[in-house]
Amino acid sequence: MLLLNHLQKKDQSLLSAMNNDAPFQFLPGFTQLYHEYMEENIFIAYSEKLMAFMPLRFFSSRFFKLAQILHAPIKNNIELNPQEQLDFFNELISYLNQNNSCERLVQPHPYGILASVPANSRFCEFGTYIIDLQTQTKEEIFQKFHPKYQKAIHHSEKNGAVVKFGQDVLNDFYLCYTDTMKRISMPSEELQFFKSYYNYLGSDNVTAGVVYDNDNPIGGIFMIHSNYAALCTHAGSRGE
């Protein structure tokens, strides 16, 4: 097992396979974002036995050195099967223990779903929505929406709603997002958080989208993506 870092020249040869066909958590810009903006370190764990990679976030709490798995391990940009994932985790845990790298592995983000769980872990089952965009047309995807949402979309189109994408609509997305977080009494990220994703990953990997009604922003999403997948990480709407 090796811990590699995009910011270390000695590791760049092994990490050269981490291109835009990989999940965005494996990309150099993501490592740089966490290092410079979050002031945390991202390492790519590499199993020489399995020839597979997995991103890890290292950080500290008041009492513990922690590591967070950010995505399931992959080989040739394909997730390992459940048994291979378990083998990877066991090898990783042994390495982290031997090197005193961290004292606890914490749960991944909701978009970091794993197929296996290391022995003696505390865990819960979790599901998320995954839509295959390669094998379906836009019309086929739309027909799978709940009829209520199909009707709402048709109504918006009929009344002149406009959807815009790109960094230019980031401020309007933020209005929608913070309105929602206030309504549910939850803390929100700062605007600079979203700007930093654009700064480090660029428009090839980050997209904000906003729907407008009479030029007023009424809903927005924030997507982080690569050729591997697009993930909606934040969203919100204005009004009731």
Language model segments and positions:
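Intrinsic-disorder-associated interaction segments
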Residues: Q8, P23, I78, P82-Q85
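Acidic, aromatic-enriched beta-alpha/helix-loop junctions
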Residues: A72-N76, Q85, N97
